[in-house]
Amino acid sequence: MQVIYIIKWNAMRVKHLNLFTILVTFSLLILGGVVHNTQSSLACPDWPTCYGSFFPKMEGGILIEHGHRLLATLVGFLTILLVLFTFNNYKKNSAYQSAFHLSCVALVMVIAQGILGGITVIYKLPTIVSTTHLALSMVFF
């Protein structure tokens, strides 16, 4: 049984997806620093929405904070794709075993980051949660 088969995903395509995911993740880390330095962390008082909307008026701190959330969502989807495609290739070729396991670890870390980000907003920036969110982002990248 194949998990996903949209196009024939050979090793080169999986490699390109991986590199794109790394680039987007690095951009997310940079944007996370911008969120902190511009004090935009609580520009959206609720989570996962922003003022009750998934697409609020994007200006000022809201643009920065909600943009960070949207980019994080993209990283999540890309990581899910990596898990699916490495699993699909792992079933055909055991050389993908470590890639599959690493992509699973990455997915767990992305989910943890999403939860920590949500807790950070809901509980108004508790130091331990914010610090853990930062530390996990460093470990992830």
PLM region descriptions:
Residues Q2-A11:
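Short, Lys/Arg-enriched N-terminal segments with co-localized hydrophobic residues
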Residues H16-N18, A95-A106:
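Membrane-interfacial loop-to-transmembrane alpha-helix junctions, especially the N-terminal start
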Residues H16-Q39:
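N-terminal signal-anchor transmembrane alpha helix
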Residues S27-I30, V34, L74, L78, ...:
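Residues within alpha-helical transmembrane segments of multi-pass membrane proteins, especially transporters
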Residues V35-P45, I111-L134:
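Interfacial helix-loop-helix junctions of multi-pass membrane proteins
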Residues H36-H66:
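Extracytosolic (periplasmic/ER-lumenal) interhelical loops and adjacent juxtamembrane/interface segments
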Residues I62-I80, T127-F140:
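Membrane-interface loop-to-helix entry segments
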Residues V83-K91:
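Structural signal for the C-terminal ends of transmembrane alpha-helices
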